[in-house]
Amino acid sequence: APETVVRVLLATAGLELTTQFPILSPSSGQPFAFADLRVDGTNLLLEIDGLVKYSAGNRSGLAPSEVVIAEKRREDRIRRLGWLVERLIVREIVTPGLVVRRVRRALAGVDRVA
């Protein structure tokens, strides 16, 4: 799976990650979303996007435009809670150096958390 490839690339680069990191609703304390990866000790979340989700043959049954809008709303809600989100596209992961550089660049602007 693409998430596994990214996790291994970044772990090899010395980053510690949590997979399927739950994003909790402040009102209920329950997860409303799961990020593909979280860079431990930071507020940086990584989402790995394939193209199938945004195609007419996606599993949700929604039109591609509706999928994009739903993803945008989900990401906006996550960002309002103070998380930073870096999106990687599946075709980018064939260039390991690019993935590591993008994540390191994103880390330059993150908050360190316990």
Can you name each region flagged by the protein language model?
Residues 1-114:
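Surface segments flanking catalytic/ligand-binding clefts of nucleic-acid enzymes
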